[in-house]
């Protein structure tokens, strides 16, 4: 019982630290911007939607800090031994499977009538039209999320659910979906979380 409580506490800590870093960095960037340009606090709410450069910068910085903290503390598993074995067939299968979940995720979205909020969708589109935004969304953020949700959270869940890996994978995928904060991303992130969780379980590597 003590072991269960300890593992749950660690998982809770990982989630809190991950979210706290995002919030603190966003407010630090936004606050600094408002002070520098002598803008009223009322502008804070829509600042990230209107200023894509600020959004990209805060996203990159918060992700890099997340990676640094989790690796420095030893909270995440990040072995490259599996990648060194050149498992190209497995990696190719994972890429194909990742592309393959797009159709069922779209189908589920249509079935449950869930859509990403318009402002958020527009923000992502604008970010993807910026080279640094593309790097942030396509490379840095996913790597930070893998460090946290597979390298740290799933690793603890696999210890907690010893002998029941699919329970651990499913729970970590649901947590991954919930953290994204809206129903549309919840479906996509949860399905992707199952795939990436399975890969982590089979390989012991987030890469």
Predicted features by range, described:
Residues 144-171, 198-206:
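Membrane-interface helix/loop boundary segments of multi-pass membrane proteins
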Residues 178-184:
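Membrane-interface helix caps and helix-loop-helix hairpins in membrane proteins
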Residues 42-49, 75-147, 154-160:
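Juxtamembrane helix-loop-helix connectors linking adjacent transmembrane helices
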Residues 1-79, 87:
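N-terminal, membrane-interfacial amphipathic/helix-forming hydrophobic leader that caps
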Residues 8-12, 16, 52-53, 91-96, ...:
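Hydrophobic alpha-helical transmembrane segments
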Residues 57-61, 131, 135, 187-195:
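Membrane-embedded alpha-helical segments of multi-pass membrane proteins
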Residues 139, 173-178, 194-198:
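Alpha-helical transmembrane segments of multipass membrane proteins
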Residues 23-27, 31, 185-207:
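Functionally important transmembrane alpha-helices
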């Amino acid at each position: 019982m003590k072991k269960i409580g300890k593992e749950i506490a660690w998982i809770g800590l990982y989630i809190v630290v991950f979210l706290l870093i995002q919030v603190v960095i966003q407010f630090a960037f936004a606050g600094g911007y408002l002070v520098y340009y002598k803008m009223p606090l009322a502008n804070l709410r829509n600042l990230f939607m209107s200023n894509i450069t600020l959004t990209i910068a805060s996203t990159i910085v918060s992700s890099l800090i997340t990676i640094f903290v989790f690796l420095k503390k030893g909270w995440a598993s990040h072995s490259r031994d599996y990648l060194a074995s050149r498992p190209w067939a497995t990696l190719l299968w994972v890429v194909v499977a990742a592309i393959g979940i797009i159709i069922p995720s779209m189908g589920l979205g249509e079935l449950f009538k869930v859509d990403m909020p318009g402002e958020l969708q527009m923000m992502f589109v604008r970010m993807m039209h910026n080279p640094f935004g593309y790097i942030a969304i396509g490379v840095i953020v996913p790597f930070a999320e893998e460090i946290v949700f597979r390298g740290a959270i799933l690793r603890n869940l696999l210890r907690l659910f010893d002998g029941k890996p699919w329970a651990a994978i499913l729970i970590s995928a649901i947590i991954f979906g919930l953290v994204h904060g809206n129903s549309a991303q919840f479906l996509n992130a949860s399905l992707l979380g199952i795939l990436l969780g399975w890969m982590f379980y089979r390989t012991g590597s987030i890469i």
